[in-house]
A protein has these predicted regions:
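Carbohydrate-binding surface patches
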Residues: 11-49, 82-138, 143
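Ordered core of a single globular domain
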Residues: 4-11
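Short, surface-exposed loop motifs enriched in S/T, G, D/E and P with embedded aromatic residues
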Residues: 151-155
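Short acidic, gly/pro-rich beta-turn/loop elements at beta-sheet edges
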Residues: 50, 132, 149, 173
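Solvent-exposed beta-hairpin/edge-strand motifs
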Residues: 54-68, 134-149
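Aromatic/acidic polysaccharide-binding cleft in carbohydrate-active enzymes
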Residues: 1
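C-terminal beta-strand-rich structural cap/linker in extracellular carbohydrate-active enzymes
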Residues: 55-114, 118, 156-176
């Protein structure tokens, strides 16, 4: 494991050097694990963390598993603060304020797309518009208990699969 701290110029310093130079007070840290997992945290409440391709807002974070299958971030890509997670089992995005677009999700609110045995389940809190980069298929609107409400209108545009909000729907079952 390697722990480093960023200095004011964005250079990553080993902990021993960062302690001597007071860089640890900036609260901008990167941890690299033996399996290739990397975690970057900007604990600074006022300054951005910009170093080696990482650009995080105050109190932001970014991490990627060693195999590249899991990515999590709290960032402000395109000027929109959002929390994002992408994994083999689900994609999650919570936008803060306006529409957020990340690698495999797009929404103005909070949305989740989880893998099921025969496709996916899309949950959009407040039944707000959202889109995911999934192959798609037929969509069925479900209420909170999982009861079918009817077929929902779904579209694929520019690689984004979206379901038109269906009145009373809690989630959407998307079959391959």
């Amino acid at each position: 494991m390697k722990i480093e701290y960023a200095d004011a110029e964005g250079r990553w310093l080993p902990t021993s050097v960062a302690l001597m130079m007071d860089a640890v007070k900036r609260c901008q840290v990167r941890v690299a694990y033996r399996d290739g997992t990397v975690v970057c945290v900007n604990g600074n409440e006022k300054e951005r963390l910009k170093s080696g391709g990482i650009d995080l807002p105050p109190c932001g974070y970014w991490a990627k598993s060693g195999d590249g299958q899991i990515v999590v971030a709290s960032d402000d890509v395109g000027g929109v603060r959002a929390d994002y997670c992408e994994s083999p089992k689900y994609i999650f995005l919570r936008a803060r304020g306006s529409e957020a677009v990340r690698a495999k999700a797009r929404t103005e609110g909070t949305a989740l797309c989880r893998v099921t045995d025969d496709g996916w389940e899309i949950i959009s809190l407040g039944n707000r518009p959202c889109a995911f980069r999934i192959p798609g298929g037929t969509a069925t609107a479900l209420d909170f208990e999982g009861k079918e409400l009817g077929q929902a209108e779904a579209t694929v545009k520019d690689g984004w699969y979206s379901v038109k909000p269906f009145p009373g729907a809690f989630s959407y079952r998307v079959k391959r």
